[in-house]
Amino acid sequence: MEREIIQTLDGSTTIHLKEWDECYHSKHGAIQEAQHVFIKNGLTLFENKSVSILEIGFGTGLNAFITFLESKKLYQSIDYVGVEAYPVSAEEVLSMNYVAELNAEKEAMIFQKMHESNWNEQIKLSENFMLTKRKQFFDAIDDIEKFDLIYFDAFGYRVQPELWSTAIFQKMHNALKPQGKLVTYAARGVVKRSMIEVGRSEEHTSE
């Protein structure tokens, strides 16, 4: 599938899949979306705590990188697991301008290390941030009550409805601790219904 790097409205870059006319992030702003959906509605709910996070769709690493930056401000200890079936290429990673757009030049090596680290191995990015990238299909996730927070950032329902099925959300429900939260950018009715069917009615969604 043909891919291209585009600039979103907030100046940050993303990957556009031409055949699907689908982007890895919102065209209105990749960084803006990550900060609003996953940080404001997710990470900040766990201030001053140790937080275990599962990201569904590691992609360009933007959510992981912003989480790293924000966790330093919030004095959080993070155990981050990012699941991705189709990793982005090294060339695409180099085209992402997140370090500059986030004024995070001092942490440029962290973003690089996130992508250069081996799959399926836990690495220590700092004293308070552990990262594991799992090369895995979403329907193979079998964690049980392991995570405080899930960033559900799969491609949209329009192009991959199977990723938004009740079966997938049952796996998400199983992976969350009893008081865990799932956050996602999508607010479609079918998504909310799937969440409710598996007993998760408190998730935060944002379009």
Features from the language model and the residues they span:
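Rossmann-like AdoMet
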Residues: 1-51, 68-102
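Local beta-strand N-terminus motif with an aromatic residue
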Residues: 50, 146-147
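Glycine-rich SAM-binding Motif I of class I
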Residues: 61-65
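S-adenosyl-L-methionine
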Residues: 92-144
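A short SAM/SAH-binding and catalytic strip from SAM-dependent methyltransferases
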Residues: 148-163
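Conserved beta-strand signature within the Rossmann-like core of class I S-adenosyl-L-methionine
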Residues: 149-151, 178-186
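A short glycine-rich, Lys/Arg-flanked "PGG" loop and its adjoining helix->strand segment in the class I
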Residues: 162-179
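Residue-level detector of conserved catalytic or cofactor/ligand-binding positions
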Residues: 202-207
